[in-house]
């Protein structure tokens, strides 16, 4: 069951660009910091935040790889 939820969350994030995911991550952190949520809601938000952070990092890693490849190709010429 947890694996199905994780898979659904990954699919949900797949369509988000870096900026969208980062904005949602910031909003998620703000909601958590504001408090007043139930334990279950807090955990769900925390899990979403972790998934968003990983998605953002993957986007940044991909951008870095593209830049590195472009620089390497330019240096070969």
Question: What are the functions of these language-model segments?
Answer:
Residues 13-74:
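Amphipathic, hydrophobic secondary-structure cores in small proteins
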Residues 1-9:
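N-terminal leader/presequence segments that are low-structure
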